[in-house]
Amino acid sequence: MQPYELIRSGRRTLALELRGGRVIVRAPYRTSQAAIDRFVAAHADWIARGLA
């Protein structure tokens, strides 16, 4: 799995952002780490294309 920076906030949904060769995940406070990892794994192809 691609390493990522996690930013927790009051938002209601998960979001992925690619910026400067980094993967940034924005997640609600209440989201478990396992759910975040599943979300990142499910978008691995998109992340790889974006970082290529």
Tell me what each language-model feature is.
Residues 1-52:
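Active-site-proximal or metal-binding-adjacent scaffold patches in catalytic folds
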